[in-house]
Amino acid sequence: MSHRRMQLALSLVFILCGLFNSIFCEKQQHSQQHANLVLLKKISAFSQKMEAHPKAFAQELFKALIAENPKKNIIFSPAAMTITLATLSLGIKSTMSTNHPEDLELELKLLDAHKCLHHLVHLGRELVKQKQLRHQDILFLNSKMMANQMLLHQIRKLQKMDIQMIDFSDTEKAKKAISHHVAEKTHTKIRDLITDLNPETILCLVNHIFFKGILKRAFQPNLTQKEDFFLNDKTKVQVDMMRKTEQMLYSRSEELFATMVKMPFKGNVSLILMLPDAGHFDNALKKLTAKRAKLQKISNFRLVHLTLPKFKITFDINFKHLLPKINLKHLLPKIDPKHTLTTTASSQHVTLKAPLPNLEALHQVEIELSEHALTTDTAIHTDNLLKVPANTKEVPVVVKFNRPFLLFVEDEITQTDLFVGQVLNPQVE
């Protein structure tokens, strides 16, 4: 099952290439269907070569982002990226003919694979209901193109996607319109969402997600105070440090030079925080993929006195710029930029003959953690849980996040990473 989720995660590289042919009506419908069939076969064939767990793919993305942004706070959602693009892949599938056995077989495989994402989709909706998450997908289509309305209806139905028609020929006006609409829909002040836009752009996909987890056991607001956070050996900043003492999952790895704690959010979601030792942040990152699972396995419940900074992080990802940098470029079919997909009725053979369209895809994530995560009623209900029993003889382990650290928000049922990030400076959003 995890293998199928990995297939969908990897397929996002190819989905953007195939989306144009599936959304816009062309004169040669026969050609369109066969082109889509070939693209989907390549998605399946190339994805099957990768047998790693979805976490491995998330870590590859993480490494690429860190290489590009070594001194920035980072946060992204592998799950949100996968769900959004997988929904669009259904649009490609829906335009294909199922008259041939091989077409039907591929379609069934894709449907079966999408079932693996149903849990994540359901989880996302539950988090929205619990007011822990806001999620918005917006698809901007070139207003000068004739769109397949049946397909657009399917995308709206499956993903509740906001679809807007826009004229990309006036790039400055289009950039402002996109930023304004996204800000209005996501209730955020977004500046320079798109810095570079081609007037021949066919579509622009914006995926925005905001997460503010509700901890089952809140931090105590009266204990929050200003303290030093060490950005490096020479630089420190004053930040609001939260505190609490409670039983939580704790583990320590001398091999990884890191300490880990895990706290539950409301629902089947948990926050995993990893604190590399001073001077060992880069070393922990290198070993993270192989050692994180081991670190979680050796964890046990301990009484922990936790000190953690309040933070709010916003981070943007441009798919087009990122994907070629995550060691997946060699999996892409080699397409001459001067060619496009066509077919002949006699041979049913797909050849390549004109340029592929310009596409844009952006992923924006915001995450916030504070001591005010719980509602008043829940905070009162759990007040007793925050207190350490007076007769306890256990000495609490002190874990102080006063230097750069890593975070993971994980789905407890599938162990899927909902969010992955690094906090280098809690003062900077």
UniProtKB/Swiss-Prot annotation:
What biological processes does GO assign it? female pregnancy
Q: How is it modified after translation?
A: Glycosylated; carries the so-called mannose 6-phosphate lysosomal recognition marker on its carbohydrate chains.
The reply to whether Glycoprotein figures as a keyword in the UniProt entry is yes
Q: Which UniProt keywords apply?
A: Glycoprotein, Pregnancy, Protease inhibitor, Serine protease inhibitor, Signal
Summed up, the tissue specificity of this protein is:
Secreted by ovine endometrium under the influence of progesterone.
According to the record, the signal peptide region is 1-25
Protein family per UniProt? Belongs to the serpin family. UTMP subfamily.
What name is this protein filed under? Uterine milk protein
